[in-house]
């Protein structure tokens, strides 16, 4: 830690306080995440250290790079590249009645998918994607932050400030207690973020797990074994769930064209095995008119 000075506290993440800092010799500005673990006495589990060390290998233009892992007084500090704005703050800053430019929505979605495909190809899941951990710079680049931390530390039910961790972007298989899940969980989250890029509003904003599920069911219909084989045998599926009929996504997401709605519907397919993959999503016609500079990134 002696290589870095803390400049100021910039926020509170899922796992602890985040500081803006500076490397003493290079002058490079960084984000320093202090990881607060449940069991302070035992120190940091070696499994977490191993997991985190692997994340230093994830180098991609759309992934916030982990530059250093430091220990101080049995506290773990993760040193990341610094970006000053997250997507939630950006969406909140757009004046009422105005929306993000449709070409920027497309560019951001494409970059998010590029980042996710890179990580999925290395068998790393995110599991907790949301606008707060998508960081942007002033050049139109968006990067995914906090990759792999869920596996290293678990996802707490509450942030250490006792704020409840958001469920709005969580996939139905996770909400229904599936023990085995994979890369499609991230695609679902990206789908809900895609809708929010277009409308500035969370697509499904539940305030409990059951409320979250019912908001999804009301929009997309209550799933059954016909549309999603074996869903009825998932741990938290109840035969007493109200049986809603599928509605139209277009009524929930007004600012997307036909191709955009088609891609969104493929990202929000109930059956994880049928949900579009990141790689397939990048080749969807929605991106046909995307600036070739972004495709080359």
Curated annotation (Swiss-Prot):
The modification Phosphothreonine is found at residues 14, 141, 161, 222. The modification N-acetylmethionine is found at residue 1. SMART domains: S_TKc. Residues 4-287 form the Protein kinase domain. ATP binds at residues 10-18, 33. Induction: Follow a cyclic expression; during interphase, accumulates gradually following G1, S to reach a critical threshold at the end of G2, which promotes self-activation and triggers onset of mitosis. Induced transiently by TGFB1 at an early phase of TGFB1-mediated apoptosis. The modification Phosphoserine is found at residues 39, 178, 248. The active site is at residue 128. The modification N6-acetyllysine is found at residues 6, 9. The keyword Glycoprotein does not apply. Phosphorylation at Thr-161 by CAK/CDK7 activates kinase activity. Phosphorylation at Thr-14 and Tyr-15 by PKMYT1 prevents nuclear translocation. Phosphorylation at Tyr-15 by WEE1 and WEE2 inhibits the protein kinase activity and acts as a negative regulator of entry into mitosis (G2 to M transition). Phosphorylation by PKMYT1 and WEE1 takes place during mitosis to keep CDK1-cyclin-B complexes inactive until the end of G2. By the end of G2, PKMYT1 and WEE1 are inactivated, but CDC25A and CDC25B are activated. Polyubiquitinated upon genotoxic stress. Its EC number is 2.7.11.22, 2.7.11.23. One of its GO terms (biological process) is protein localization to kinetochore. It catalyses: L-seryl-[protein] + ATP = O-phospho-L-seryl-[protein] + ADP + H(+); L-threonyl-[protein] + ATP = O-phospho-L-threonyl-[protein] + ADP + H(+); [DNA-directed RNA polymerase] + ATP = phospho-[DNA-directed RNA polymerase] + ADP + H(+). It is an enzyme of class 2 (transferase). It comes from the Eukaryota. Belongs to the protein kinase superfamily. CMGC Ser/Thr protein kinase family. CDC2/CDKX subfamily. Plays a key role in the control of the eukaryotic cell cycle by modulating the centrosome cycle as well as mitotic onset; promotes G2-M transition via association with multiple interphase cyclins. This is Cyclin-dependent kinase 1. The gene is CDK1.
